Amino acid sequence: MRPKTFPATTYSGNSRQRLQEIREGLKQPSKASTQGLLVGPNSDTSLDAKVLGSKDASRQQQMRATPKFGPYQKALREIRYSLLPFANESGTSAAAEVNRQMLQELVNAGCDQEMAGRALKQTGSRSIEAALEYISKMGYLDPRNEQIVRVIKQTSPGKGLAPTPVTRRPSFEGTGEALPSYHQLGGANYEGPAALEEMPRQYLDFLFPGAGAGTHGAQAHQHPPKGYSTAVEPSAHFPGTHYGRGHLLSEQPGYGVQRSSSFQNKTPPDAYSSMAKAQGGPPASLTFPAHAGLYTASHHKPAATPPGAHPLHVLGTRGPTFTGESSAQAVLAPSRNSLNADLYELGSTVPWSAAPLARRDSLQKQGLEASRPHVAFRAGPSRTNSFNNPQPEPSLPAPNTVTAVTAAHILHPVKSVRVLRPEPQTAVGPSHPAWVAAPTAPATESLETKEGSAGPHPLDVDYGGSERRCPPPPYPKHLLLPSKSEQYSVDLDSLCTSVQQSLRGGTEQDRSDKSHKGAKGDKAGRDKKQIQTSPVPVRKNSRDEEKRESRIKSYSPYAFKFFMEQHVENVIKTYQQKVSRRLQLEQEMAKAGLCEAEQEQMRKILYQKESNYNRLKRAKMDKSMFVKIKTLGIGAFGEVCLACKLDTHALYAMKTLRKKDVLNRNQVAHVKAERDILAEADNEWVVKLYYSFQDKDSLYFVMDYIPGGDMMSLLIRMEVFPEHLARFYIAELTLAIESVHKMGFIHRDIKPDNILIDLDGHIKLTDFGLCTGFRWTHNSKYYQKGNHMRQDSMEPGDLWDDVSNCRCGDRLKTLEQRAQKQHQRCLAHSLVGTPNYIAPEVLLRKGYTQLCDWWSVGVILFEMLVGQPPFLAPTPTETQLKVINWESTLHIPTQVRLSAEARDLITKLCCAADCRLGRDGADDLKAHPFFNTIDFSRDIRKQPAPYVPTISHPMDTSNFDPVDEESPWHEASGESAKAWDTLASPSSKHPEHAFYEFTFRRFFDDNGYPFRCPKPSEPAESADPGDADLEGAAEGCQPVYV
């Protein structure tokens, strides 16, 4: 950077002494040397040859290392020729009249009014350039004025975009004046104000264009009066060998001054000062400093670098250029350490494809982005100080030192905007942050050197030669929207689209609204307008919105209420179960007497299992995870089959219920109650539920597989039980019902079909389809809405008298007696249920309590000892009437030999509810004389059972009655989808809402092995090798409780 003080010589004295010596030296000038510069054939000879020769001699003298106090006369001779324009400063020019037009132009250019007036007086108002020279020479008195002149010299008005600019004077091509010869400028005095003295007259014209305003699209320009001749107005076509092609310059209104921060607020900013540092750069180290349109210098190259080997430093221009278009080239200037020939050598060989767009600086001129959006800077001549050789290279032509090389603009329709009329611009404080261009990929345009072109150094940026200004802190990205000027940073298609929208007069908000509904062409623009910090995903099209709305509308407020009530209840229940498991662990550890370290280890194991359980609960299950082996039984609206889980090869009993049948028969509440009791039951009397899940058509219960069969199958085989066997089973049944009552449930469907016998001969309860816990979710009315038929499963229906579904006669019978018993079972247990074991208060709906289950115990005891139910009838309707009139229909046959205790227990259980045993719980039955031989204080399940079923292998199903695979349930299953669709009626609009919170997974899942298989009596004869493997795997499996 040039030093702030003047003169830039080795003289060490104050300013007043220097002025005095200058004046004395001017009175006694020394003889000038006759050595001159090399003059070309077309050089300008208007300057005195003696002056040129003297200056050349002074340069040669300065190249030598002079001592601090060198020859004084040579220094004065140097100063004399640099101050020739001010030779009359001590004459009558002080009283000369100041040209008001020139004064105004200097003030507009940023000069101080007092200094401008003094300069015009001292120069006699000859020209503006003379006044600027005076101001620059007096800049040591006021550094601000020196800075103003330096900025004016380094910058120039922007290039115009008019296709045919008006030429106010003959161009260089048509005059006798030719471009002066190339000569080197060296020495310290050329860094100071005397640099303009070396400028030929033709190049000074480009520093001071007219101040008139004109529209860019007009063919003619209006030119107000100027303080200098119109013959020196800038508009010329540069021909010659120095240029790769012709460059056309046109006049632009005002001075394109890039003012420094010291006087920026004193003068009105112009349209050119709104340029900012380019956001991206070409790959070849081509980046951009803050001053647009300029090339700044690099200071790290040696002065002896040959021509063409110096880097060029690019500063972006205002508008973009496109490949193949005759648009504005980037204005180039050589570095201070390079030759001017570098520019012309590159200019003739390097194709400039494009110039990257420079971003607008937010500190400058925020309100004028639309007045002249395509005006670029016109670069002024750049001074150099590194030309130490007095002679140019012989291989180079004689170029001039002008670096304001521009190209003719062809107006591109993309860059055209509607400009109504030029208006004077004033400095206004910013009221809104400037629109920041969206981040784009760096420009891919680079300088591609043709063959024979020199330039080994990459193009990079040097910020040392220009006044840098730090940008302000950025605004939040979500507050910055793209402006009209941002259209230059996108591709050509997006440019055309955005300009067409702006010409139609649409606002940014309108375009933002239309972009969400428009075509794919403005997808890029729509993405840039989205708020970047929003965490909510933005839906791209209206079709997704419609799908989302349809999904939301499909769930009614009733469904939301239904779901939330059950969900909150289950969340609370889950927490209570977690606390209960922790308390249970603490109690067990206290009983075992574990030390503190062992207890802590057990707690960690429980915590890990809790974490695994939470993760497994979220895993979705479906029926494809199981393989069906064999059907075990068929119920009213479902079936039970033996299934194997694929991953663990464990055997389960999987109960499947069709949703359509559950809804048609109003069994939603009963299914919910069955799921709840099976999930909550954690004792040895109830079949354990491991998983429950659902799909579109069915509900699935995955439970313990009890291989011993049910009590009904055993009754059919044995017909009549011995009294000791009946006593054992009724005692276990009493304990099982007691456990259900303690859980808060009523089974309501205790019958031999729902009593299973495990492999040890002990019983378990199953099929809680009619169970109720007196909960709001177990109430059938909670699931009913509209005009849906309200019918309980135990209410007589039309199918009760229809025994056409009984197919016992279709089977081949080996024994007539067995066939008759099977038909009797069909009569007792039809597909729609039987009232044989139901208490009369339940059938009469007079209100019932847990006593109804004890009625069923008396009926089962009667059937075990007698061989048939007490209210057997040909049809379910007749059976129901007999149950209701139990006082007249209940008779114990006289031919059956029963003990008095058994008769008494039957009559005390099958009686009115107010005098029935069990009012005080199961203790009433335990105290009955019939159980005198049973010790209820001991765990009865640990006692050996009178009857142990025969199980040959884990998948043995011989204890279950064979089931016809072509049963009505299977025939109807093919029409389940069709029947399911017909449920979408006004009375049952959303049937799937009834099965919320159905999914379940047990915490203690026994590692996938639900039961223990006993060793077969003869393994070699009863099991094949595959079955033996399964048997061995399940042999040692016991429930694992932490």
Swiss-Prot record:
The lineage of its organism: Eukaryota, Metazoa, Chordata, Craniata, Vertebrata. Its cofactor is Mg(2+). Residues 932-1010 form the AGC-kinase C-terminal domain. Belongs to the protein kinase superfamily. AGC Ser/Thr protein kinase family. The keyword Transferase applies. Residues 30-44, 258-267 have a biased composition (Polar residues). The modification Phosphothreonine is found at T267, T999. Residues 626-931 form the Protein kinase domain. Its EC number is 2.7.11.1. The keyword Iron does not apply. InterPro entries: AGC-kinase_C, Kinase-like_dom_sf, Pkinase_C, Prot_kinase_dom, Protein_kinase_ATP_BS, Ser/Thr_kinase_AS, Ser_Thr_kinase_AGC, UBA. ATP binds at L632, G633, I634, G635, A636, F637, G638, E639, V640, K655. One of its GO terms (cellular component) is nucleus. It holds the Pfam family Pkinase_C. It comes from Mus musculus. This is Serine/threonine-protein kinase LATS2. Residues 97-138 form the UBA domain. Signal peptide: none annotated.
